[in-house]
Amino acid sequence: MTNYHERIRMLRKESHYNQTQLATFLNIAQTTYSDYEKGKVRMPIELLILLARHYNVDMNYICGISDTKNPFPCI
């Protein structure tokens, strides 16, 4: 099972974003985002949800529970 911090790093790189761009999107400092990717600090669930929506992947995927990229559910 992949940790969420590894998964958000992988998704960022696949999407050709840098940490500063995602930090701006999430309205946080780049250093904070870097700490999330390194697993130094836990990312709040609200930010994980925003990233899952942004990348259009479900929470099971972004949290590393599943390796299947299902789309983010539309409600």
Model segments located where?
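A detector for short, charged/polar N-terminal pre-domain segments
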Residues: 1-6, 70-74
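Short, charged recognition helix plus adjacent turn
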Residues: 53, 63-75
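Conserved hydrophobic/aromatic packing and binding residues within compact polymer-binding modules
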Residues: 8, 22-23, 33-36, 62
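Short basic helix-loop element that most often maps to the first helix and adjoining turn
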Residues: 6-25, 50
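DNA major-groove recognition helix of helix-turn-helix/homeodomain DNA-binding modules
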Residues: 27, 46-61
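Recognition helix of helix-turn-helix/homeodomain-like DNA-binding domains
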Residues: 27-42
